[in-house]
Structure formats: structure tokens, C-alpha cells
């Protein structure tokens, strides 16, 4: 069950759900329910000791709890709520009903303890506290309540915000109780390292590389007399710092009044510092000319090395309100007073002009985009161009504003986007860049007219001139017979225009010149208009033939280059990509450019500790080799690994692409159903990426090799072998036994363990028993329908993880899923080691080889790849699994007719080994409208339920068993046709016409 509150735990965030059931009853004897969400900042105390007494706070938010229509029984549903990862939540229900009540919590297929009690108002209270929210604890929580009057169900849906990476939050200060010291706190995931940065100088001169800077990696600071004091928190995402706001009475006041912004509920800290030759002076704080109340300030003093007295007076408020806004003035009997303006806001803001801006620059002009803004809290920002993101730097200005500049445009015309956000606000500003260029002119002529074409920016204008055959000068302007077509403009590029001259007898036999001009200059072309024959002749035949010769030579060289490149085909790129959505539509996204990220050397593994074996796969760009890695998982232990590498003559772009893939994998994290990164070798030699080794190869060949060993149930196997396998299925100490459905949900794992399972065995015993069980199962060398379901479930679970990490796979197929011990399957991306030139599954389309039969329509026809296009590919993968490795669309070649079939909504027939329910899932994955396809969390839930049902049916005649499938599916909620109508709706089963 979810981790309950523990004594003494410090929680960064507490979210409380309350559902209050009042005594008023409708005509149908249904209770009136009000669901409430209450957010808590809980930094000083832990959640209550018992889940029966959760915290309650102010500022409730109505979740609009309503009776669910068309549901069996009385079901109330609260609005879906998203919480941060590692948040702590309490689900609470108050029942205003006479008599005793009984209750039951149900979460992901499992019943959880429920202990109601009564409060002072004689209301029944049911609560559950979950600490440090993880992905496995997100889902639907059902509370079944039975009173003397009626029965009803309350449904809470809790999900984790789908952020690209973890969080790093700006630290803040708190006074240590009974001591003159400050505590620095940062609520971040993963847990940050907190450090104090002390500097003897102020502002820009206080650089961290300066010898005057002192760093202290501790959370409590007693040395509070320094000139510049900052607290910084750092984790995998980087570093965030907060400066202790200081008024120094010995410094000359700033030209503009210093300003400090805070949000309601945040702590306020202002330090007033003064130095004098003796101790005969004091400091006071005033807010709007009124002395601060006692308890909102404290003073410290010390003597410096030159025997001068240093006094500091802190003004602080533990949780500010709107009435704390105003001018805070620090006064001294020996120094001029100084003030600061403190502004308290309800929520964060970003103030800047968001109107789009257009710029025109010359080809070699130095230019930077810039955005000037005022924001609180500090923003996170990116610059984006052509779906690529670039680092964003900020610089503070004296007037409280900040500025961000982007100069790395490389004079590429187009649309540039500045995006900024903080915890409460978002801001986007668009820029358009045009490059001014002199027009370039091309000319052609026929028997009746001459035409000239030009591109340039700004829009060029045209003139035609007639040249005398006795003089090279062309001075006589032609105005009759000239027709200028309407100009077109390339997207964020040059203007393309043309002008045509209709021939007349007056100009035949003469040279004419067409000229295009704009503010950058003029370009001209000369044409000879001949009267005999339909074709014009260029005046200089030598130049004409020389041009033809150069063109032919260019064509020959280009052909040779194309032939050379054809062998190598296209530049290497990882199919797995992390995306950043930029708009409300899934189609508005760009791939995260990991070239700008730093590689974390903690992943570096000594290449001398690798002993290479055989080649597992080889392709146009690289190969994957089996190897033995010594000490990569545990000192003194060797394991088998798969090493991904480029071929010897890889160019710099391919090495850069492989390094980008490495950086992405380090950010991705690990999952049981993903081929996980174990380490890398990047120093002093070729780049090696070290992955988990899967001993049984890819799922496609695994299924094909097991066709003769397939049985629908274990009962068939026992009958066929006269129950000779029965001793194999005697229960091991760690086996899952029928009828034992009690589970525990661990906050740091997807795994489920029985309450009476392996808790009395050592780790070595458990590892030995598990290995022994796996070897016995694999010796059977059989494949069952439950195995197929388990494969489908595990792949969906892996894709659910990738969806949570904002990743798209783009080549999901059975050939890209690997099988290892225990029939565990793992999604991989070893396209580098696949020879797509000779693989018939990859078909030439445009200038690329693509896995056409696995691709969604939007990917095939529009080049759009989203998690929904991966769902389509997953449907094809399901078809592969339940046909035991048959190639999709059997007997249908990939030609123009195939593309028409896809556009017309054609679907494959039900595969031989699939049930009707599985086939319906396939059809829903193949919805032409991507919005009607199910999500991977829905697919995981449904397949987990199917797997549980199949398990019950298959083993009903067996006293003891060991499941072939890892039991991770048991932590999924049951699939409900009422709860997931979108998954099996007729709209998802039948394509739009």
C-alpha cells in the first residue's frame, strides 16, 4: 500500500484532498458531496503520526465532485488533480451520517487498510496519507463507504505533472530556533546539495572564482556578517541561488530604490548592516514609518579585525501577506537611513511586451535579439529556432529589470521564439528575422517573349532596356509589352518575382537587358532577340558553350557524390528522441537538442575493463558488440553487456549524434522495460555506449522460434506431457500463490511484493531462489497465451515510461524489443547496428528509408512523430505478437496502392492467436485521428487486467504455480468499460471516412 506518514519526516509539500458528505439527501436518497483540494507548504513539521489525523489548512479549492452518469452503483467523481513528484498528499473523507460506517480503499487492483474514526462534531473521518509521491503511486483511488442509510463510492484521480525533467527550486531562508543562525531550504527533486557562498565584495565583482569567495556545503549558517551572502542549491538539473537581500548603510544609496518581490506565504528576509568606529550606535526597522513589531526582527553584532563595530539587524516575516507590502526603512543614529520597497503579490508574474517584432539586417551585420522583462520568481527560459532549442542567458539591470539576448542566429532568416516561465506564469515572444540581399537574376527566352526571374530582399523592382548593336550601352528604356507577375515570398525568406517582355518587330534582332534592383543594389541579364527561328542565341557563344561544359562537369561530380553517399545513405540519428511541446497541439513540438548539454562524467567507465566478444549486429553507421564488463554494477563482479559504437571511419557529425544520444540516455533514467544505459567510454578513444545485455535477442525472432512450442494454456502443456512438469511448479518461498492478493506499493519501485512473501529471506537467498525459478521455467522452452499478454503489457509499460519522460520512439516494432531472462522484454533503439539497406522492412520514401508498415498516417504523409504515432506502431507490434512474428500486412506490397489503403482506413484482420478484446485494442490504436487513440497508461491498465484474468483462467486447475510474467501488472487498476470508454468507443474502432 502507499507509504504512510512516518514520525519526524520533513515534507516539502503537502496536498490534502477532502470530500465532505453532508446530511442533506436528495429525493433519491443520494448524499450531497463536496470535494475539496487544500494545498499546504509544510516545511517545519511532518504530517500527522496517524493517517487518521491529517493536516487541514486554509484556502480550499472546490474540485466539483459530481455524480457519475451511466455508472453501475452510486459513484461520485472529483476533478482530476495533478501534483508534483515527491509531493505528499492526504486523501480525506468526512461523513455526516448517523451510526457507524465501514469503508474500503482500493488502489490499482489492491485493497488497502481503512480505519474510520469520529471527530468532535461526530462526523466519520476516513483518511489516507501518501508520502513522497512517485509515478507508481499515481492513479485512481476508490473509497467504498457503507453506512446504515446507503452505500456509495468516491473516486479520486491523482496524477504527477508530466515535466520533461526533475525540478530545481530556488532556495529560501528560515531562522533556526533559539539560535542566531539561518537555515537554507530548497524543495527540489532529486534532493539537492545546499551550499552557502560568502563574498567580501558586492555585485558583479563577486565572482565565484575570486579568492575572496568562500563556499560552505551546509544548510545552517552562523557567519552572517559578510558583505554578500548567497545560498545555492544544485542537483542534476543545475544550480539555483538566492541572495540575502541587504541594505548596507555604509554604502552610497542606489539611484533607484531597491525593490524586492515576494508571493503570499513566502518568508521575508531583509538584512540591515552598519559599521562604526565604536559600539555607541543602534539600528531600527520601520514599515511605512511604523516600528516593526517585536518578534519580527533580531540583532547581531561583532567586532571586526580593526576593532570597528559591525551591527546587523534582520527584518523577517515567516509567511508574508498582502499587508506586508510597503517601504522598509533601516535607520541608525550614526548613518543616513535607507529604504527598500517590498511588494507582495498573489502569484508570480512575468512583465514584458509580448508584441512580435520584425527585423531586417544585412548579410554580415552584427545583431542580437533581446527581451527586457521583470519577473518573479526568476524565470527559466529558452530560445527556439526551427524546432531547435538554444541556451538562454539572463542579466540583471539596475532598475529591477532583466535582459536576455540571443546572438547565435548565424544570419538565418526565419521565426525566433523566446519562451520564459516560472512557477506561476508563462511568456512567449516572437521575432522575425529577414536578411537583406541584392537580387539575383536569371533569364530565358522563347520565340515570342523573354522572361527574367529574381529573388532578393527587399522586394526588387524591374526595368527593361534596349541595347544598340553599335554600342554596348543599353540606355533606351522599354515600357511597352512589359508584364510584371505578382511577387511571391518564400517563408521567412527572399521575395521571388518575375518580369516578361512580349516581343515586337521593333525589338527583334536587338539585345535587351532586364534589371532587378532594390536598396542593396542592381543585377542585370542580357538577351539577344533573334527574328529567324524559334530560339534565341546568347551573344557570346564561347561563354555559352563554356557554361554548358561547366554544368556537365558539375553533373558528373554530383552523380559520383550521390553514388558515394548512397552506400552510406543518411546521417546517423537516434530514433528515440526527447521532445518539448510548444503549443496546445501535440503537433507543435521540437526535438530537444542535447548537443548543448554537458556530459556527466559519473557515467564514465574504464574502457580497459571491457572484454569484447562477438558482434550482435552491424549496420551502415556502427555496430553492437557483446562484452564482459568488470565492476560496472558491483566491485569485483563481471556481467555481460551490449556495447554500441560507431564504425572506424565515422565523421564528426556522427560522433556528435552518438554523444547527443548518450546525454539523452543519462537524462532519461532507468526502467525495467527499457534497455538501460549502464555507462560509457568517451575519453581517449572511440565512443562506447554500454547497455544491458538481453540474452534471447529480439522479440520478433524469439516469437518465430517458439511457434512450434506455443500452447494456449498450461493445462494443455500438462495434459500433453502427462503432468510430468508438475514438480517444477511446487511453490518456492518467493512464489506468488493463488488467492493471495494483498500487496504493498513501494514508493521507489514499480514492483509489488506479497505481505507474507520474501520478507523473511536474505537478499542472497532471494536472488538464488529467483535465479533457480527462472532457469526451471526457461528449461520448459514453451510459450503460452499469457506470455503474449505479458509481452504486450511490458512493452506498454515501457512506452508509458517514455511518454512520462516526453520521449517518442519513432520505430516501435518487435525487432526493436529485446528478450532476456524471465521472459522480460525491453524496448531498445539499436538502429545504428541495423543494415536498413538490405532490410525489406525499411522502404525508400522521399529521401529516407522508413519502416512504412509500422508508421502512423501523420508520420507517413506529414512527417509528424508524437507519442500518439507511437501508439499506432504499438498496435502493429501487438499484431506481430499475437501472430507469432508474421510480417504486418501480409501479401500487400508497399506501393501506391498501399498508401491509398492506409488513407482509406484499411485495418488488418484479427491475428490468429488474439482474442476479440485484444483485437479491439489494436483497432483503437489504428484510429486515423490520433486524438482518438488510447494513451499508454490506458493500454497498460487494460492489459494488466487482461493478464490477471488470463492468469486466473489458465491456472484454475493447478494447486500451485509460478507466473511466467513479472508481477508488476498487479499494481494496475482494473480496466473498466465505464471508466475507459474512450479506449473502446465506436469512434476509436471505426475510421473516419
UniProtKB/Swiss-Prot annotation:
Signal peptide: 1-26
Residue positions with a glycan: 43, 100, 151, 306, 323, 351, 354, 473, 502, 541
Topological domain spans for side Extracellular: 27-543
Xref: SUPFAM superfamilies: Immunoglobulin, Protein kinase-like (PK-like)
Description of how activity is regulated: Present in an inactive conformation in the absence of bound ligand. FLT3LG binding leads to dimerization and activation by autophosphorylation.
Example GO biological process: regulation of apoptotic process
Tissue-specificity statement: Detected in bone marrow, in hematopoietic stem cells, in myeloid progenitor cells and in granulocyte/macrophage progenitor cells (at protein level). Detected in bone marrow, liver, thymus, spleen and lymph node, and at low levels in kidney and pancreas. Highly expressed in T-cell leukemia.
Active site: 811
Transmembrane segments: 544-563
Important for normal regulation of the kinase activity and for maintaining the kinase in an inactive state in the absence of bound ligand as annotated region, ranges: 591-597
Side Cytoplasmic, residues: 564-993
Note: Can be used as diagnostic tool to establish the exact cause of acute myeloid leukemia, and to determine the optimal therapy.
Subunit record text: Monomer in the absence of bound FLT3LG. Homodimer in the presence of bound FLT3LG. Interacts with FIZ1 following ligand activation. Interacts with FES, FER, LYN, FGR, HCK, SRC and GRB2. Interacts with PTPRJ/DEP-1 and PTPN11/SHP2. Interacts with RNF115 and RNF126. (Microbial infection) Interacts with human cytomegalovirus protein UL7.
Protein name, as recorded: Receptor-type tyrosine-protein kinase FLT3
Species for this entry: Homo sapiens (Human)
Lineage: Eukaryota, Metazoa, Chordata, Craniata, Vertebrata
Gene name of this polypeptide: FLT3
